[in-house]
Amino acid sequence: MTMPVLIMAGGTGGHVFPALAVAERLREQGVPVVWLGTREGLEARVVPAADIPLESLRVRGLRGNGLRGWLAAPFVLLRALWQALGVLRRHRPRAVLGMGGYAAGPGAVAAWLTRRPLIIHEQNAVAGLTNRLLSRLARRVLTGFPGILPERGGEHVGNPVRDAITRVPGPADRGAGAHEPLRLLVVGGSLGALALNSTVPAALARLPEVQRPVVRHQAGERTLQQAREAYDQAGIAVDLQPFIEDMAAAWTWADLAICRAGALTVAELEAVGVPAILVPLPGAVDDHQTANARQFVAAGAGVLLPQSELSAQRLALELKTLLADPPRLQRMAQCARGLGRPDAAATVARICLEEAR
C-alpha cells in the first residue's frame, strides 16, 4: 500500500479549507491522505465528508484557560504527543504537512521525533507562536504572504484555496460590478461576527432605497437569530444563512463583500477577484488580520475599516461611495484578482512530494 501524506489542520475554516485544497491535489495524483485533527473542530465534520480518514488528538488551546489550564498544559501536550506518535506508527506517512490548529503542534513534534519529513505552512501575514517554534523542526517552511519567517527560509507560495474557487471566471467574464442592483455579500467567517451582524443592517438602512444592494449574509449558527432581528428592525430584505457551503458560488455572485480579514477569506477574495470592505477581528492574536488586509488594500482592491471605527454611519458612507461607482468596483475586482495565487494548493502538494521519504 502507498504510504500517505499526513495533513494536520483543524479548528476553523481558515486552517481546514486550505488543507482540504492541498488534499484534493494530492489525491488527484493518487496519493492517499490521512488527517490529524480533533473531535471538536470543523474538521470533525468536513474531513469525513470528503472521504478522508480522520485521526483525532485530545488537545485544546492554552490561551484563555487560566492558571489551571497552564498547570495542566504539560500533561495535555504530553498525552497529545503520545497519541500523535501512535498515529505516525500506524500510518507511516511519507511526509507530514502542518497547516495550523491544536493538533499541529504535537503532530509536528512527533514527525520530527520519528524523522518524517515535516513541512509547515503559515497562512497569516504574522507568523503564530506555534509555527515560529515548529519552523526550527521543519524541512520546508511555506507562507501565504511574502516576507514571513525569512530567518527560517520561508517560501512564499500563497494560501491554498479549493479547486472550485480557482475555477470561478474572472471579474469581467462574470459581469462583476455591473449587476443592477449591485450584490453585497457579508461574511463573518465560519463562526460569524456579531459586529457585522448588527452594524451592516443599520448601515444599509441609511442608504437611499434606490442605492441599496441585494444582500446575502453568512451570520454564523450561534449568532443567526441576532442578525435576523437586526435586519427585521432595519427593514432590510436579506438572504440570511448560518453558513455558506458553496463559497465559490457566493463569491461568483458578489459585486462587493464586507468581511473579516482571515487569511482564507483574503485568499479567496484574491482568487476570485472580489473587492471588499475588510473589518479585521480586533482580538486576533498579534493583530494578524490587520496585517493580512494590508497588501489587499494597498493594491487598490479594498477598504480597511478597523472595528474600533465601525459604526452604521461610517459603514454607510463607505458603502454609498463604492456602490455609487460601479466602474471603481470593477477596477478593484481586477486588482484583487491580480493578487491571487491559484496554483498555491498544487505548489504545496508538489513540495510535500518532493520532500517525501
UniProtKB/Swiss-Prot annotation:
EC number: 2.4.1.227
Entries under InterPro entries matching the protein: GlcNAc_MurG, Glyco_trans_28_C, GlycoTrans_28_N
Entry's Gene Ontology cellular component terms: plasma membrane
Catalytic activity: di-trans,octa-cis-undecaprenyl diphospho-N-acetyl-alpha-D-muramoyl-L-alanyl-D-glutamyl-meso-2,6-diaminopimeloyl-D-alanyl-D-alanine + UDP-N-acetyl-alpha-D-glucosamine = di-trans,octa-cis-undecaprenyl diphospho-[N-acetyl-alpha-D-glucosaminyl-(1->4)]-N-acetyl-alpha-D-muramoyl-L-alanyl-D-glutamyl-meso-2,6-diaminopimeloyl-D-alanyl-D-alanine + UDP + H(+)
Main enzyme class: transferase
Transmembrane segments: none
Gene3D superfamilies (UniProt xref): Glycogen Phosphorylase B
Membrane topology: Peripheral membrane protein
Keyword line: Cell cycle, Cell division, Cell inner membrane, Cell membrane, Cell shape, Cell wall biogenesis/degradation, Glycosyltransferase, Membrane, Peptidoglycan synthesis, Transferase
Xref: Pfam families: Glyco_tran_28_C, Glyco_transf_28
Residues given in the record as UDP-N-acetyl-alpha-D-glucosamine binding sites: T12, G13, G14, N124, R162, S190, I244, A263, L264, T265, V266, A267, E268, Q289
Pathway listed: Cell wall biogenesis; peptidoglycan biosynthesis
The organism's place on the tree of life at top rank: Bacteria
Listed NCBIfam families: murG
Family statement: Belongs to the glycosyltransferase 28 family. MurG subfamily.
Function: Cell wall formation. Catalyzes the transfer of a GlcNAc subunit on undecaprenyl-pyrophosphoryl-MurNAc-pentapeptide (lipid intermediate I) to form undecaprenyl-pyrophosphoryl-MurNAc-(pentapeptide)GlcNAc (lipid intermediate II).
Name the record gives this protein: UDP-N-acetylglucosamine--N-acetylmuramyl-(pentapeptide) pyrophosphoryl-undecaprenol N-acetylglucosamine transferase
Species of provenance: Alkalilimnicola ehrlichii (strain ATCC BAA-1101 / DSM 17681 / MLHE-1)
Gene this chain is encoded by: murG
